[in-house]
Amino acid sequence: MALLGDIVIYIIMAFVVIGAVAAIRDDERGMGKEFLEGLHSIGPIFIPVAGIMASIPYLSRFIEWAIGPIFGLIGASPAMAGTTIIAVDMGGYQLAQATAGDTANWIMAAIVGYMAGATIVFSIPVGLAMLDRRDHKYMALGIMSGILTVPIGVLITTSILSITGANVRDEVSTTADSTFSMSALGFGTILTNLIPLVIIVVAIALGLYFYADAMIKGFMGFGKIMDTGIKLVLAFSIVEYFTGFFSTVLGGWGFDPIIADAQDQFRALEIAGYIGIVLAGAFPMVYAIRTYLARPLSVVGRRVGMSVEGSAGVLAAAANILALYHLVRTIPPKDKVLCIAFAVCSAFLLGDHLAFTANFQPNMILPLMLGKLGAGLIAMVVAAWIAVPKALELERQDREQGVIGVDEYLAVGGLGAGQQESVEELAVGEQKGTDNPDSDPQRSGR
């Protein structure tokens, strides 16, 4: 496991150098552009990381008092509650250690944070901010479909760690020896810890199947509230850091610092920075794969019923969900849902999460990659069954209302035969002089 981690890191570091040289020659295209975008991603990553990590003292109390006891009644570790909603690289790793009670449960809780937590605190608020409003409903369908396979991804990764007896670090460190054997994590503990997650995903599945419209509205409301809270906490933390205003006026400040201090060397700014400097190599690496393997990727995409844009979206998500969000507008609605469903568990596979794991738990790289990838692929199958029919219905409505242009996405194979015929009928109607000003493609967008 350690050897694989070293190999991956050295490959990424080679692309850091290649990307830097390319940026010197031309920083507006190719690997040079990808190198700089990796570094520039530190900012977007820092916003939610800082907001969540600063809130950890209050989130910890909320989890310990409100959610943890519910998990405990089932027999699951309270640490699982925290990483269900907080990403591992946004404070979930440290929070899980503080609430787990032992290393085995800490590591399992951290794995949940790579999938469920990353989605709740990062992918959702950032997606709502980056995507066109017309794409929010497709994002909701994709997210809710992808959440259903989180227990599968956690089961795959923890099973590999347990069976192989992989050694992990038993403290938050980038330099400590890996001395704790994960063979201590038994299958009984794994299954017990997964019970709350299974209950949550079953509830989501039932809601998505029977009340899709209400679930979409609830999802978007939740994301907006979270995004607002994160930005306010970050703003207040910045004011407090430079002025001490809140400590002076209120007599105390319960939030954690967002910049390293004597108490903790891995605060929000440092973690975002660690991730960004690794992405400076990961992004050029993915660019090379996407460029030089474009033909086989398109062949694979066609065989599974996806457009070339959709196939590129899947690969982009594997590096960083920001890269996927950048492409979403060009991807047909059906493939938007499939890509985002894949991204719930598999996003950051070759980017942020690879970087974080390589820094803090290098022996977990292979089991984590297999778990995330397996769950992501299964999520696409689930989404095709439970969410794509609704997505096609919404696409038809968007076309009729002019939100999506009549010819938009047709060139990339986003429609089935039935939708193709319907769109042709709309186009014929327009050619005959149908008075429908809302069908103007120029009016689509936010």
Regions found by a protein language model. Give the residues of each.
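Signature of multi-pass transmembrane helix bundles
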Residues: 1-51, 108-113, 123-281, 358, ...
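Juxtamembrane/interfacial segments flanking transmembrane helices
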Residues: 27-31, 63, 289-296
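Short amphipathic alpha-helical coupling elements at transmembrane boundaries
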Residues: 33-41, 68-73, 224, 295-306
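Hydrophobic alpha-helical transmembrane segments
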Residues: 53-61, 83-96, 128-129, 169-179, ...
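Transmembrane alpha-helix boundary signature
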Residues: 55-65, 95-103, 160-163
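Alpha-helical transmembrane-segment detector that highlights a single hydrophobic TM helix
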Residues: 63-84, 259-268
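Alpha-helical membrane segments and immediately flanking helix-loop junctions
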Residues: 74-149, 307-361
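Long, well-ordered mid-to-C-terminal structural blocks that present hydrophobic/aromatic surfaces
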Residues: 247-309, 313-322
